[in-house]
């Protein structure tokens, strides 16, 4: 039930961003954000009270849809409010907060589950959704300029579908944006490869206790946070290039440590740096995409956000094939090589075509 629930919410997170992002480019950010939070709160409450598995699984999918709206709209709102270095800094801060959440959420969840059971976690999430919905309704101010809302509504034939097709065509026709999408896909492959294989690597291969595994996982998550903080201080073009090369080098070193059966203390520094370079890359890709397509920031953020979950869905099952350290090494190195190749091409293409747009 747990695995099916996680799978359903992941599909909801991927699909919801592609649904809500384009709508927000036409209708503004406030109303979609409010209704997404309402959907999240209602479906979370139903899931918490569910007594039948099929009801729980359906609610988890729609819960993901609602949460996805909040994810993509937070990025779109940032693109409405900030430009240049400020946008890069804000994206870095967001990624750093996510890294901190990655460390603290499992521990807090375990404490709540011990005290109130898994349903208690859902009721707390329901309360958070209600509070955020009220804040959105009564405090949040629309960030998408009225002129852009009116312009979007006056599309070629006055329909939303046509506007979405036009936005899709412009994104697909942009080779730089497509390169960023593939780079995000590969970086997410490393992230989810790490998440899905880490219990088997650290608890199985290195025989760590649950407590030490939790500390190790938290330390590596802090590596992502550190990389995100650094990413907020440099331009996205440089962060994408440095991050790709760094991930490849660290992936090779981690693989060598696994192949030669070195100790945890030999592997851990390179593993930490791999996560740090990953944290450097992820917010930079989002910043670059939103900078290039500010007029359709919702759609651009939706594509970049959704492709991350696609990467996770493609890579996570692969970690169950063969010996886990070898499989993880192959995933890390292959993704690293492709990241470097795309980064070199992307770097040249950006400088030739759009260097001024991405210079912070």
Show the residue positions of the predicted features.
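Helix-loop-helix hairpin linking two adjacent transmembrane segments in secondary transporters
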Residues: 92-138, 144-145
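Juxtamembrane intracellular "pre-TM" segments in multi-pass secondary transporters
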Residues: 143-180
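Helix-breaking motifs and short loop linkers at transmembrane-helix boundaries and internal kinks
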Residues: 28, 49-55, 66, 257-261
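Conserved MFS/SLC helix-loop-helix module at the cytosolic interface between two early adjacent transmembrane helices
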Residues: 15-53
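Paired small-residue
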Residues: 39, 43-46, 54-62, 265-270
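C-terminal transmembrane helical hairpin of 12-TM major facilitator-type secondary transporters
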Residues: 240-282
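Cytoplasmic helix-loop-helix junction between adjacent transmembrane helices
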Residues: 61-100
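A late C-terminal transmembrane helix in Major Facilitator Superfamily
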Residues: 290-324, 332
């Amino acid at each position: 039930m747990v695995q099916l629930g996680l799978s359903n919410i992941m599909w909801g997170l991927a699909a919801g961003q592609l649904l809500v992002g384009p709508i927000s480019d036409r209708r503004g950010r406030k109303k979609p954000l409010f209704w997404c939070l309402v959907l999240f709160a209602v479906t979370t409450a139903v899931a918490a009270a569910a007594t039948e598995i099929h009801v729980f699984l359906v609610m988890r999918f729609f819960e993901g849809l609602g949460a996805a709206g909040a994810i993509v709209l937070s990025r779109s709102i940032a693109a409405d409010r900030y430009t240049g270095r400020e946008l890069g800094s804000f994206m870095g801060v967001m990624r750093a907060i996510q890294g901190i959440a990655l460390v603290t959420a499992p521990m807090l969840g375990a404490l709540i589950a011990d005290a109130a059971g898994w349903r208690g976690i859902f009721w707390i999430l329901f309360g958070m959704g209600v509070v955020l919905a009220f804040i959105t309704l009564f405090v949040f101010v629309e960030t998408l300029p009225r002129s852009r809302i009116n312009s979007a509504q006056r599309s070629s034939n006055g329909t939303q579908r046509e506007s979405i097709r036009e936005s899709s065509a412009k994104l697909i026709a942009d080779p730089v944006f497509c390169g960023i999408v593939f780079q995000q896909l590969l970086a997410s492959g490393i992230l989810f490869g790490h998440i899905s294989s880490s219990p088997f690597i650290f608890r199985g291969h290195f025989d760590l206790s649950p407590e030490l595994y939790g500390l190790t996982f938290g330390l590596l998550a802090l590596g992502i946070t550190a990389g995100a903080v650094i990413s907020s201080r440099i331009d996205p073009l440089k962060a994408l290039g440095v991050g790709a090369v760094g991930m490849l080098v660290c992936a090779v070193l981690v693989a060598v440590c696994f192949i030669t059966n070195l100790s945890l203390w030999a592997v851990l520094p390179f593993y930490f740096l791999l996560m740090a370079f990953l944290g450097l890359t992820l917010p930079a890709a989002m910043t670059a995409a939103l900078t290039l397509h500010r007029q359709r920031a919702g759609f651009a953020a939706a594509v970049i956000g959704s492709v991350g979950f696609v990467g996770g869905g493609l890579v996570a099952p692969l970690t169950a094939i063969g010996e886990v350290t070898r499989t993880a090494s192959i995933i890390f190195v292959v993704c690293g090589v492709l990241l470097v190749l795309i980064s070199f091409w992307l770097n040249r293409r950006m400088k030739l075509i759009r260097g001024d747009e991405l210079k912070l």
